[in-house]
């Protein structure tokens, strides 16, 4: 007959195996998504403001804005966060390609959304 030590060890291993399986499935559970949304709702909305305008809007920061090279910062949230910093010259050079890239990505998401419903 099977010893009690073997039965206890099998029981312990099966419980540990179930814990591992539950940990793997929690990522897809609705509770995880709700917790993630609560975390995101606590964040203040990001300010989208070119740094060149900061000195104009806040005169006390004008010295810092003039010292730093003109930069443009673009951020948006999708299923993931994306942030891009470009200088004025880089934006002039790559602005159209970046705009087309973002339009293509966002347009694909709009096309896929009705198909998923």
From Swiss-Prot:
GO MF entries: G protein-coupled receptor binding; ghrelin receptor binding; growth hormone-releasing hormone activity; hormone activity; protein tyrosine kinase activator activity
Propeptide, residue positions: 52-75, 99-117
UniProt keyword Membrane, yes or no: no
Pfam families found in the cross-reference section: Motilin_assoc, Motilin_ghrelin
Signal peptide: 1-23
Stretches assigned to coiled coil: none
Tissue expression profile of the protein: Ghrelin is broadly expressed with higher expression in the stomach. Very low levels are detected in the hypothalamus, heart, lung, pancreas, intestine and adipose tissue. Obestatin is most highly expressed in jejunum, and also found in duodenum, stomach, pituitary, ileum, liver, hypothalamus and heart. Expressed in low levels in pancreas, cerebellum, cerebrum, kidney, testis, ovary colon and lung.
PANTHER family, per the entry: APPETITE-REGULATING HORMONE (PTHR14122:SF1), GHRELIN PRECURSOR (PTHR14122)
UniProt protein name: Appetite-regulating hormone
Upper lineage: Eukaryota, Metazoa, Chordata, Craniata, Vertebrata
Gene from which the chain derives: Ghrl
